[in-house]
Amino acid sequence: THNYELRYWLAAGGIHPGYYAPHKGDTSGQIDADALLSVTPPPQMPATMEAGTIYGYCVGEPWNQQAVFKGIGVPVITDYEIWKNNPEKVFGVSNVWAEKYPNTHLRVVKAMIRAAMWLDENNNANRPEAVKILSKPSYVGADEAVLANSMTGTFEYEKGDKRDVPDFNVF
């Protein structure tokens, strides 16, 4: 979704983000573009920007907050400000897999629904515990303070500029 949100935002500001033409053999999305957009794995974005390989990035959290935390960048806008309550993440499986593992499929979907409910219940009271879990190397592995900035209803645009954004992460 970030690719489309970035392209929408750039176009709304008068910057042509380019377009895709797979029927012409082009899948880069750079045709007639005013800006070069490239793909970098999200966890590598802060280090790639710090190295000077890229000048900015569009990504989900906690990688924007990581740039603020490291002092190498600042978010200029959130996707929530571009499109409130936008569809963010998708869990998809193939029909073949769903038919081969129907019980597993059902259990995974139920577990995700329960986790989402747990994250949102009691006015987000479980978010601090989720931050501790996600900070472990076997999960996201980002610093707790970085994760907390977006998971607990605040967002830091630059060092010291923390704002309440209670609906930033709604599950």
What are these regions (language model features)?
Residues 1-11, 84-88:
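Extracytoplasmic ligand-binding site segments that recognize negatively charged/polar headgroups
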Residues 10-20:
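A short alpha->loop->secondary-structure connector
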Residues 11, 66-80:
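Ligand-binding "clamshell"
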Residues 20-50, 62:
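Short helix-initiation/N-cap motifs at beta->coil->alpha
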Residues 45, 50-59, 71-73:
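Alpha-to-beta junction loops
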Residues 73, 87-96:
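Small-molecule pocket liners
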Residues 99-171:
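Secondary-structure end/capping motifs
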